C-alpha cells in the first residue's frame, strides 16, 4: 500500500499600492496589503511634520464590500493608542494586523472610527479591474456642490500675499 501525503501551502495574496476612492488625510497611505489564511497585514507609509506625532486607534477596523468588519489586532512598528513620533525625515513605515479577509472580497474601507481627525481610507481595491465601477461612499463626501453657484469675476488687484511651501 502506497500512501502519499500532500500538504498544500496557501499562497499569500499581495496587493501592491492598491488604488482607493478617497481618504480623510494624506498623512497615511497604504503601500501594500498581504492577505494570508491567518492574518491580513496592511503596510502603511506615514508622512507628517518631523518631530510631531500621529496615532492609530485601537478601535480601527477594515470593512469589506459585503459589510463585514475586521477589528485591528495590533500594530507592528507602532503601538496602538500611543503617540508615534515622526522622525526628522517626516516619513515612517509600520504595519497594521487584522483577521484574515475572505478571497471573494474585492474592496475594503479602513477606519479608526467616527471621531474628529480619524484616519479613513474608502474603497481600497483588492481587484484593480473593479476599481472604476466603485461609487464614492456618502460619508466620504464632505462638501456639497452647489451647481447653480456663480463664481466671482476675476480681477487684478494690488495686495499682500503669503506663499509657504517647499521646493
Segments (PLM) and residue ranges:
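Bacterial Sec-dependent N-terminal signal peptides
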Residues: 1-14
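The feature marks short-to-medium sequence segments in extracytoplasmic or secretory-pathway proteins
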Residues: 47-87
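A short, amphipathic beta-strand motif
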Residues: 163-167
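Beta-strand-rich domain onsets/edges
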Residues: 141-162
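Short, well-ordered beta-strand segments enriched in hydrophobic/aromatic residues
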Residues: 39-48
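Low-complexity, acidic Ser/Thr/Pro/Gly-rich terminal tails and inter-domain linkers that flank the onset
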Residues: 12-37, 66-78
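Short, solvent-exposed, Trp/other aromatic-anchored flexible loops in extracytoplasmic proteins
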Residues: 71-108, 112-115
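Surface-exposed edge beta-strands and adjoining flexible/disordered loops or tails in beta-rich
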Residues: 109-140
Amino acid at each position: 500500500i502506497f500512501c502519499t501525503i500532500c500538504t498544500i501551502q496557501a499562497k499569500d495574496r499581495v496587493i501592491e499600492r492598491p488604488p482607493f476612492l478617497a481618504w480623510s488625510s494624506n498623512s497615511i497611505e497604504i503601500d501594500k496589503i498581504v492577505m494570508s489564511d491567518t492574518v491580513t497585514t496592511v503596510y502603511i507609509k506615514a508622512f507628517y511634520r518631523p518631530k510631531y506625532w500621529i496615532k492609530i486607534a485601537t478601535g480601527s477596523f477594515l470593512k469589506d464590500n459585503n459589510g463585514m468588519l475586521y477589528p485591528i489586532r495590533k500594530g507592528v512598528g507602532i503601538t496602538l493608542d500611543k503617540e508615534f513620533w515622526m522622525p526628522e525625515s517626516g516619513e515612517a513605515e509600520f504595519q497594521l494586523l487584522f483577521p484574515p479577509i475572505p478571497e471573494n472580497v474585492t474592496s475594503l474601507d479602513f477606519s479608526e472610527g467616527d471621531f474628529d481627525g480619524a484616519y479613513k481610507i474608502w474603497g481600497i481595491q483588492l481587484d484593480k479591474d473593479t476599481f472604476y465601477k466603485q461609487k464614492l461612499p456618502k460619508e466620504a463626501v464632505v462638501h456639497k456642490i452647489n451647481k447653480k453657484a456663480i463664481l466671482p469675476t476675476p480681477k487684478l488687484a494690488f495686495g499682500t500675499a503669503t506663499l509657504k511651501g517647499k521646493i
